[in-house]
Amino acid sequence: EVKLEESGGGLVQPGGSMKLSCVASGFTFSNYWMNWVRQSPEKGLEWVAEIRLKSHNYATHYAESVKGRFTISRDDSKSSVYLQMNNLRAEDTGIYYCTTGFAYWGQGTLVPV
């Protein structure tokens, strides 16, 4: 059974920082690109960041709205992906999901700013 479990959400003040974590099980994590996606009433579903494989030197890509503020990383030995969020803004409020190539999704974690 595939599982993606996010944690680390919670209330944060504007300008603050937060780190989200997602632990995966049920598939070979190191073989999958991983993404963070967020959902809000105002913007709907919005892709946030992507991290590729070791063979791609863990290349990362970001939405323009978070570039320079958010950092995605992964630890294949722990089957985990992370999202460090700095200088948070009200518009960053949403439910944050980790996903593979959009085939598998976690349950989401709420980040109210």
Swiss-Prot record:
Protein's GO biological process: immunoglobulin mediated immune response
UniProt keyword Cell membrane present: no
Cystine connections: C22-C98
Gene Ontology CC terms: extracellular region; immunoglobulin complex
Pfam families with a match to the protein in the record: V-set (PF07686)
Keyword list, A-Z: Adaptive immunity, Disulfide bond, Immunity, Immunoglobulin
Signal peptide location: none
An example Gene Ontology molecular-function term: antigen binding
Stretches assigned to the Ig-like domain: 1-113
Note: This chain was isolated from a myeloma protein that binds inulin.
Listed name of the protein: Ig heavy chain V-III region U61
Organism whose genome encodes this protein: Mus musculus
Upper taxonomic lineage: Eukaryota, Metazoa, Chordata, Craniata, Vertebrata
